[in-house]
């Protein structure tokens, strides 16, 4: 042990990049929420087949993540209270559905996941959502920001502030739903399973009223018209702000989301 502690050959020192401060603050804010958390599986056999047929027909790949964002946005647009935000004695429910996603980028020598908000995702088709995500992935980080597409000086200054000041900024923003929506949207989606194979669930951590983690897609036996068939199932984990919405409303939302996904909603 002494040899390891006394020699640089026994360990490696890495810089604590500024973006990790933002993540730590968001986790701390999320820990203050009273969230309902759950796990589910959805049959995406038809959707995956449509994605494969589209590629065979056009030579272009449609993104599963973009499609999932579209499905979530559609389900939320039909159950808007699910993404409501509290302001004092009122709940503010926005007409537009803004979805925050995480996009991996190189920041210097470090690979980091940076947030990007797809605005009005409910009013865009899959191709528009995908094009926007692809553009964000190619976004130039020569002048790095902690949020892709953000032009806010506060967002760039934020990680350089002392912890007490950062948390004060967060509390001020969190009291105003319009500020929350402008900075982070109202829903977060993390596509963990699109990065690597994940046979299981990883729960999302977010202070937003609704968050999803898209985990792995696996083949499992399922029942279709009383027949056992091999089906493709995607594992989803979710968290909902219980202070703002009840279980029955969450169930209706998840039921609609399941219908959209099983039907391959909006896929050609």
Where are these regions (language model features)?
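C-terminal catalytic/motor cores of large multi-domain enzyme assemblies
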Residues: 1-268
């Amino acid at each position: 042990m002494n040899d390891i502690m006394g020699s640089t050959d026994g360990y490696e020192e890495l810089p604590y990049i500024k973006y990790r401060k933002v993540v730590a603050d968001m986790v701390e804010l999320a820990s203050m929420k009273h969230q309902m958390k759950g796990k589910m599986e959805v049959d995406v056999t038809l959707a995956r087949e449509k994605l494969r047929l589209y590629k065979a027909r056009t030579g272009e790949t449609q993104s599963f993540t973009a499609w999932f964002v579209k499905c979530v946005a559609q389900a939320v647009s039909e159950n808007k209270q699910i993404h409501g935000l509290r302001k004092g004695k009122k709940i503010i429910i926005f007409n537009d559905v803004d979805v925050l996603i995480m996009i991996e980028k190189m920041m210097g020598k470090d690979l980091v996941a940076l947030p990007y908000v797809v605005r009005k995702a409910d009013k865009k088709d899959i191709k528009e959502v995908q094009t926007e995500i692809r553009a964000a992935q190619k976004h130039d980080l020569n002048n790095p920001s902690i949020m892709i597409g953000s032009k806010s000086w506060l967002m760039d200054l934020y990680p350089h502030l002392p912890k007490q000041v950062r948390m004060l900024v967060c509390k001020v923003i969190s009291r105003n739903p319009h500020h929350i929506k402008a900075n982070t949207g109202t829903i977060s989606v993390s596509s963990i399973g699109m990065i690597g194979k994940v046979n299981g669930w990883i729960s999302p951590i977010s202070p937003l009223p609704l968050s999803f983690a898209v985990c792995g897609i696996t083949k499992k036996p399922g029942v279709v018209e009383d027949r056992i068939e091999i089906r493709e199932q995607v594992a989803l984990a979710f968290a909902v702000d219980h202070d703002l919405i009840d279980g029955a409303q969450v169930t209706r939302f998840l039921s609609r989301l399941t219908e959209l996904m099983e039907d391959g909603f909006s896929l050609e």
